[in-house]
Amino acid sequence: MSEVRRPERSGGPDRPIGDLHPDYPLPDVDHPVTRPFWDGCRERRLRVQRDRETGSFHWPPKPSTWKGGRLEWVDAKGTGTVYTWVLGREPFLPAFKDLLPLAMVVVELDEGPRLVGHMVGCTPDEVAIGRRVRVVFKPLTERVVLPVWELVR
């Protein structure tokens, strides 16, 4: 398991953009299994793995040797529906206190896989199972860009 990284307080590619809390946990964008996903996010592209033989999509990412190396990274449309959601009212980490209330969602992509994220640009009253959403990208540092979700209006 990777060590939790935190934003750098001075200089470097992991210095926060905006007012990111200094204890905000950052994903390991250099992990060999997930690096293509994070590279895609930096390029504002939502990437998932697809089996070259069956055409089925896979999430979470698998090692490149899984299924004999048949998986390839492809761009998803970036749209889907809210499969389920929960409203966070208590900060499970101090870094998330200023984000509350936070609508956390599981989005079923049009391609099939389900990704976890949170909603932006709407009130919790507007979030509902079955609502159409699209991905938008939220830069946390120069290297870490998160996929988050907004309602399709």
Can you annotate each of these PLM segments?
Residues 99-115:
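Short, basic/aromatic beta-hairpin or loop at an interaction surface
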Residues 112, 117-153:
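Well-ordered alpha/beta subsegment
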Residues 41-79:
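Cys/His-rich short segments
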Residues 85-91, 140:
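Short, conserved beta-turn/loop elements at beta-strand boundaries and strand-helix junctions
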Residues 72-73, 105, 123-125:
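Short, conserved secondary-structure segments in the cores of folded domains
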Residues 57, 79-81, 85, 122:
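Residue-level recognition of beta-strand microenvironments
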Residues 66-68, 89-94:
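A short, acidic/glycine-rich surface segment
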Residues 2-46, 151:
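A broadly conserved sequence feature marking short terminus-proximal activation segments
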